[in-house]
Amino acid sequence: MKVAVIGAAGGIGQALALLLKNRLPAGSDLALYDIAPVTPGVAADLSHIPTPVSIKGYAGEDPTPALEGADVVLISAGVARKPGMDRADLFNVNAGIVKSLAEKIAVTCPTACVGIITNPVNTTVPIAAEVLKKAGVYDKRRLFGITTLDVIRSETFVAELKDKDPGDIRVPVIGGHSGVTILPLLSQVEGVEFTDEEIAALTTRIQNAGTEVVEAKAGGGSATLSMGQAACRFGLALVKALQGEENVIECAYVEGEGEHAPFFAQPVKLGKEGAEAILSYGELSDFERNALDSMLETLNGDIEIGVEFAK
């Protein structure tokens, strides 16, 4: 099993690479790529960690050597948020990066499962889809927007509020991956009751958690470490499913039936071909239904921007 981390010299990429070096199954190959010349050194550094995962780093303009033979590609390349920026501000730089990487993937590893971390995910995933379609290699089961950070934040914040073990909390998060498009289904958390005020406050905090970190870092970065953990959780789930483990379920932003939007985050059953089944997100509370209805214009607009960009 070969996993490629693209954007591996950045804050998310280095955290993700460290976690994968420690947690990938024995015998896995980990390839790191970044345009930055430090990348082979990041791989050398990580290679000293005594785990049965081989690691190699590649730098320069061409990601092809890292992508060759990859089963899973995790893309965190791009610029990070700074104070005053929202995810849409990132679009101008990151859209072009994702487009060119998708073009390389289409040629080099067209059957790989691709997980996109690069923001704005609502828009970068449709860009990648359009590029892969143009190349004639698109398989919607193999393209994911990684929204796991919204899930782990939800689990953490609920556990803190209710004094529970975060490992016991499961919160499905649907919609998209920015602002109002992030919808945690707090009505479905088992063994926990919330007041209306708690639901409103928690939902807002989860939606704005990225900004919370950007501001706390005072211009020194964005949510890199927690995102690395979230991407590792999703990447490992994908690896397990590809290797035949049953009942692997994670929320992800995928192309579905298009009931609400062409791409939508919801629980996905992962399997040997990627997304084996897109699962129902179940019954919504009135609060959640209203939040869903009011986000759809934003989400569909984000998707349309990506489709137009890739034309």
From Swiss-Prot:
Positions annotated to bind NAD(+): G7, A8, A9, G10, G11, I12, G13, D34, N94, I117, T118, N119, M227
Function: Catalyzes the reversible oxidation of malate to oxaloacetate.
EC number: 1.1.1.37
Quaternary structure, from the entry: Homodimer.
Active site location: H177 (proton acceptor)
Keywords carried by this UniProt record: NAD, Oxidoreductase, Tricarboxylic acid cycle
Annotated organism of origin: Vibrio atlanticus (strain LGP32) (Vibrio splendidus (strain Mel32))
GO CC annotation, single: cytoplasm
Keyword Lyase belongs to the record: no
Record has Mitochondrion as a keyword: no
Family: Belongs to the LDH/MDH superfamily. MDH type 1 family.
Protein name per Swiss-Prot or TrEMBL: Malate dehydrogenase
InterPro entries per UniProt: L-lactate/malate_DH (IPR001557), Lactate/malate_DH_C (IPR022383), Lactate/malate_DH_N (IPR001236), Lactate_DH/Glyco_Ohase_4_C (IPR015955), Malate_DH_AS (IPR001252), Malate_DH_type1 (IPR010097), Malate_DH_type1_bac (IPR023958), NAD(P)-bd_dom_sf (IPR036291)
GO biological process, one term: malate metabolic process
Reactions catalysed: (S)-malate + NAD(+) = oxaloacetate + NADH + H(+)
Name of the gene this protein is made from: mdh
One GO MF term: L-malate dehydrogenase (NAD+) activity
Binding site residues for substrate: R81, R87, N119, R153
Annotated Pfam families: Ldh_1_C (PF02866), Ldh_1_N (PF00056)
